[in-house]
C-alpha cells in the first residue's frame, strides 16, 4: 500500500508541474503553433510546446484539430516529431529525485535521457527523408482512408488516470490559488511538483529495495526485463492504459535509479511508450467528422508510423541501436560529475534552442 501511495504522489507531482506550466503560460503555448511556417520551425514549436504543456498527448490532439482546421500536413508532421522529443522532459525531471546519490542519479538520468536520445536520433534520420520523399505523409494518407468511419471515442471518458488524479490535482491547485495573477500560482505549482518529486523518488527508492525481492522482482523482470519484445510490449500496454508516455516513463525511472533494472532493460520499455502514446491522437482523430476527418486521421497515423519506423530503423540496425544508450550514458556521466550539465541540457534542449530558432525565423 505504501508503494501505491508513493506512486500516486509521484504522478500527482508530475501532474502539478504540467498544470503549473499551463497556468503560468496561459494560452501562450498554444499560440506558438501560429509560427509554424516551415518544417524546422515546426519541429522546434512541437518540442517547446510539449515541454511547456507537459503532455505530448495534448499537443498531438491540438495538432490533429489544427489539421482538421486547415494546417498543412507537411507542417504538422514536424510538429508531431517535436512533441515526441518534448515529452521526455518529464522523466528527466523525475530523475532529479536521485540527485543526492551519485550512482543512483547516473542510472536514473541515463534511463530518462535514453528516451530523449532515441527520439532525437529518429528525427535526425526521418525528418530529412520526410522533407524529400514524404514517406510518412503518403503512408499515413493510405491508412487514413481505411480507418475513417462513423464511430468515435470520447477521449475524456477513456482517460481514467486523469479522473484518479483529479482530487490531488484540485488540492494542489487550490493551495496556490491565493497568489495574485496566473504567473505566480503557476510557478508555485511547478516548485511544489518538483519538491514532491524529490521527496517521493527518494522514498520510493528506499521502499522498493525492501519490497522488490523474490517473487515481486521476478514478476517485474518477466514483464519488463525479459527481453526487447517483452519490454516494448509492456511499455506500449501501460501507456495505452494511462494515455501518457510521460507518466509511464516517470514510473520506470526510479526503478532504474535503484538498480532494479539496467539501462539495457529500460531502453526497449521506453520505445514501447512511444507506440502507446499514439492512441490519444488516434482517439482524437475519430472524434472529428466531415470532410476534414480523413486529414485528421492522416496526421494521427503519421504519429504512429513515425514511432514504428523509428523503432524498426534504429532498433533494427545494431549500430544505430547502440547509439541512444551510449549518448545517454555519456551525458549521465557528465551530469554526475557536474550538475551544471543537467541545467544546460534541460534548459538548452527543451527551451533555449527551440525558442532561439523560432525567434530567428521571425526576423
Language model segments and positions:
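Alpha-helical transmembrane segments of multi-pass membrane proteins, especially transporters
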Residues: 7, 34-38, 46, 50, ...
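Long, highly hydrophobic alpha-helical transmembrane signal-anchor segments
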Residues: 53, 57-61, 161-186, 273, ...
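Helix-loop-helix hairpins and the membrane-proximal interhelical loops
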Residues: 1-43, 47, 168-232
Amino acid at each position: 500500500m505504501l508503494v501505491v501511495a508513493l506512486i500516486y504522489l509521484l504522478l500527482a507531482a508530475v501532474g502539478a508541474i504540467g498544470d503549473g506550466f499551463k497556468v503560468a503560460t496561459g494560452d501562450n503555448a498554444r499560440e506558438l503553433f501560429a509560427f509554424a511556417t516551415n518544417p524546422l520551425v515546426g519541429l522546434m514549436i512541437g518540442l517547446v510546446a510539449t515541454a511547456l504543456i507537459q503532455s505530448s498527448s495534448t499537443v498531438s490532439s491540438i495538432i490533429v484539430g489544427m489539421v482538421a482546421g486547415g494546417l498543412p500536413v507537411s507542417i504538422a508532421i514536424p510538429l508531431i516529431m517535436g512533441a515526441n522529443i518534448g515529452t521526455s522532459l518529464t522523466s528527466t525531471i523525475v530523475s532529479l529525485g536521485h540527485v543526492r546519490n551519485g550512482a543512483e542519479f547516473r542510472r536514473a538520468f541515463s534511463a530518462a535521457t535514453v528516451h530523449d536520445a532515441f527520439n532525437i536520433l529518429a528525427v535526425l534520420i526521418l525528418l530529412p527523408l520526410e522533407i524529400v520523399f514524404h514517406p510518412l505523409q503518403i503512408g499515413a494518407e493510405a491508412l487514413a482512408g481505411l480507418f475513417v468511419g462513423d464511430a468515435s471515442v470520447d477521449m475524456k471518458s477513456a482517460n481514467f488516470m486523469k479522473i484518479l488524479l483529479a482530487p490531488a490535482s484540485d488540492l494542489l491547485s487550490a493551495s496556490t490559488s491565493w497568489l495574485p495573477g496566473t504567473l505566480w500560482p503557476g510557478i508555485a505549482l511547478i516548485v511544489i511538483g518538483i519538491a514532491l518529486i524529490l521527496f517521493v523518488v527518494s522514498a520510493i527508492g528506499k521502499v522498493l529495495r525492501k519490497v522488490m525481492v523474490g517473487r515481486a522482482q521476478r514478476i517485474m523482470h518477466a514483464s519488463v526485463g525479459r527481453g526487447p519484445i517483452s519490454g516494448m510490449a509492456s511499455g506500449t500496454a501501460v501507456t495505452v492504459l494511462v494515455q501518457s508516455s510521460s507518466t509511464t516513463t516517470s514510473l520506470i525511472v526510479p526503478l532504474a535509479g535503484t538498480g532494479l533494472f539496467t539501462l539495457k532493460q529500460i531502453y526497449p520499455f521506453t520505445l514501447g511508450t512511444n507506440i502507446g502514446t499514439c492512441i490519444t491522437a488516434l482517439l482524437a482523430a475519430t472524434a472529428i467528422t466531415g470532410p476534414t476527418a480523413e486529414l485528421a486521421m492522416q496526421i494521427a497515423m503519421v504519429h504512429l508510423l513515425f514511432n514504428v519506423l523509428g523503432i524498426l530503423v534504429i532498433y533494427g540496425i545494431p549500430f544505430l541501436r547502440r547509439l541512444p544508450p551510449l549518448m545517454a550514458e555519456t551525458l549521465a556521466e557528465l551530469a554526475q560529475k557536474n550538475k551544471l550539465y543537467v541545467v544546460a541540457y534541460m534548459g538548452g534542449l527543451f527551451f533555449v534552442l527551440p525558442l532561439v530558432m523560432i525567434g530567428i525565423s521571425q526576423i
